[in-house]
UniProtKB/Swiss-Prot annotation:
EC number: 2.4.2.-, 2.4.2.22
Entry protein name: Xanthine-guanine phosphoribosyltransferase
Protein encoded by which gene: gpt
InterPro entries (UniProt xref): PRibTrfase_dom, PRTase-like, Xanthine_Guanine_PRibTrfase
Residues reported to bind GMP: 69, 92-96, 134-135
Membrane topology recorded in Swiss-Prot or TrEMBL: Peripheral membrane protein
Binding-site list for xanthine: 92, 135
Keywords: Cell inner membrane, Cell membrane, Glycosyltransferase, Magnesium, Membrane, Metal-binding, Purine salvage, Transferase
Binding site for Mg(2+): 89
Residues engaged in binding 5-phospho-alpha-D-ribose 1-diphosphate: 37-38, 69, 88-96
Assembly, per entry: Homotetramer.
Catalytic activity, as annotated: GMP + diphosphate = guanine + 5-phospho-alpha-D-ribose 1-diphosphate; XMP + diphosphate = xanthine + 5-phospho-alpha-D-ribose 1-diphosphate; IMP + diphosphate = hypoxanthine + 5-phospho-alpha-D-ribose 1-diphosphate
Source species: Citrobacter koseri (strain ATCC BAA-895 / CDC 4225-83 / SGSC4696)
Coarse class of the protein's main subcellular location: membrane
Similarity section: Belongs to the purine/pyrimidine phosphoribosyltransferase family. XGPT subfamily.
């Protein structure tokens, strides 16, 4: 990936609230299935905004920090997804999204970010990201002291 897109906590919350507003009325949803790990924080934000208490996970591994690798389902939520929102942080090449669609064909699949290759596989998203851009999520970064340029 040649470019990086850094997401702050504030940006993430703003984007999640925008997505939540599109998912109203909240009474239409039985619950949320968050794709672990990228969808965990966005899933918590959606659950808060929509007042949803039923939150489950589907645990899929497809990345090793910044390298995509073979897809592995570690745990899945039961059912076909009817009445559920499935949330992930982003859709990239579409590998995870295809697996989600197969597991939960009746779910409403949403992400915060979408890259061109995976965009057709989600029902809704908030931000377009170029395909060759790596997204640095706030939960993957730490806040550190940066000394002044002058050194004083």
């Amino acid at each position: 990936m040649s470019e990086k897109y850094v997401v702050t906590w504030d940006m993430l919350q703003i984007h999640a609230r925008k997505l939540a507003s599109r998912l109203m009325p909240s009474e239409q949803w039985k619950g949320i299935i968050a794709v672990s790990r990228g969808g965990l924080v966005p899933g918590a934000l959606l659950a808060r905004e929509l007042g949803i208490r039923h939150v489950d996970t589907v645990c899929i591994s497809s990345y090793d920090h910044d390298n995509q690798r073979e897809l592995k389902v570690l745990k899945r939520a039961e059912g076909d997804g009817e009445g559920f929102i499935v949330i992930d942080d982003l859709v990239d090449t579409g590998g995870t999204a295809v697996a989600i669609r197969e597991m939960y064909p009746k779910a409403h699949f949403v992400t915060i970010f979408a890259k061109p290759a995976g965009r057709p596989l989600v029902d809704d998203y908030v931000i377009d990201i170029p395909q060759d851009t790596w997204i640095e999520q706030p939960w993957d970064m730490g806040v550190v002291f940066v000394p002044p340029i002058s050194g004083r």
